[in-house]
């Protein structure tokens, strides 16, 4: 996986370039799916480094940085010793295979680089450790582990708290013209996580122009603003802390025509009146009583009076 479209920056390096020698700078950046790291070394220094990546279901090998075997046999080292590469295999654990002067650090599929540590002295980088999310590989070219004084005073570690594979951007460093690794560092490619919060607020964005209060005011934050100035939303974990906004109407509830012992109308949050159906047990209707039977007899009486007349 390549780190495209994201800015990377250097962290380190451990060590430095030598002003009195020709320095060969190198870098291997932009890919974070490292499957193996190959390192060649003698008893004093690290002489070359190479990387293998997972790509499209296969493996791609990078350029080999440092002095090649042919160059070492031709020119030797700066102190006059030749670099002889042995081929006797020694298996130390499930991740590392050693040929005495050649080492392969093999990473698991879900493993990625998080940092480095090493010792830098006048002869170059030694005691190199590759730190990952699953542990540590090394030390490579272990010369000073038994010296507490050197370990305490000259060991340098790069740890930028990488927690995501995408944050690792690659390696960089330098070799001198004798094939000695004089410096090494890493590239970091920051990404924004939801939990990387610079500011929290109790407001929720409802449109593109105005930030409005949420209808339910919660005691926990509903919105977070990340480093890209984009809003990320969090759902409330508990409903019990939600307090609804209740509207108190400014007008009085009117009593209906039927006089009941209970209130028949009540106000709601939407400023409307809701009426309850009255129970007629205690209702006294307003109006005259029916005079139907008295009207019939009066008509009959008038009829008889007319007949008699």
Curated annotation (Swiss-Prot):
What taxonomic lineage is listed for the species of origin?
Answer: Eukaryota, Viridiplantae, Streptophyta, Embryophyta, Tracheophyta
Gene behind this chain? JAL25
- Stated family: Belongs to the jacalin lectin family.
Q: Does the keyword Transcription regulation apply?
A: no
Q: Which SUPFAM superfamilies match?
A: Mannose-binding lectins (SSF51101)
This entry's Gene Ontology molecular function terms read: carbohydrate binding
Q: Does the keyword Ribonucleoprotein apply?
A: no
| Annotated protein name in UniProt | Jacalin-related lectin 25
Q: Where is the Jacalin-type lectin domain?
A: 8-190
List UniProt keywords, sorted A-Z. Answer: Lectin
Q: Which is a Pfam family this sequence falls into?
A: Jacalin
């Amino acid at each position: 996986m390549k780190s495209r479209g994201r800015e990377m920056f250097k962290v380190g390096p451990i060590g430095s370039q030598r002003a009195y020698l020709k320095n060969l700078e190198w870098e291997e950046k932009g890919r974070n799916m490292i499957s193996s790291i190959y390192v060649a070394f003698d008893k004093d220094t690290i002489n070359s480094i190479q990387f293998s990546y997972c790509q499209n279901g296969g493996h791609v090998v990078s350029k080999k940085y440092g002095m090649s075997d042919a160059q070492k046999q031709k020119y030797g080292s700066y102190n006059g010793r030749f670099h002889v590469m042995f081929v006797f295999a020694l298996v130390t654990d499930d991740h590392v295979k050693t040929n005495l002067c050649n080492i392969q650090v093999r990473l698991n599929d879900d493993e990625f680089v998080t940092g480095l540590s090493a010792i830098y002295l006048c002869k170059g980088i030694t005691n190199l450790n590759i730190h990952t999310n699953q542990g540590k590989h090394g030390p490579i070219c272990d010369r000073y582990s038994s010296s507490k004084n050197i370990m305490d005073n000259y060991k340098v570690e790069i740890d930028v708290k990488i927690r995501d594979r995408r944050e690792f951007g690659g390696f960089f460093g330098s070799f001198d013209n004798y094939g000695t690794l004089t410096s090494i560092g890493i590239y970091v490619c920051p990404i924004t996580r939801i939990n990387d919060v610079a500011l929290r607020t109790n407001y929720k964005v409802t449109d593109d122009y105005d930030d409005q209060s949420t209808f339910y005011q919660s005691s926990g934050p509903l919105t977070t603003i990340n480093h890209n100035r984009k809003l990320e939303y969090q759902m409330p974990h508990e409903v019990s802390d939600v307090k609804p906004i209740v509207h108190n109407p400014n007008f009085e509830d009117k009593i209906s025509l039927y006089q009941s012992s209970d209130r028949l109308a009540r106000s709601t949050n939407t400023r409307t009146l809701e009426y309850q159906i009255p129970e007629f047990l205690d209702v006294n209707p307003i109006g005259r009583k029916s005079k139907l039977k008295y009207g019939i007899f009066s008509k009959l009486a008038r009829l008889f009076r007319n007949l008699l007349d």
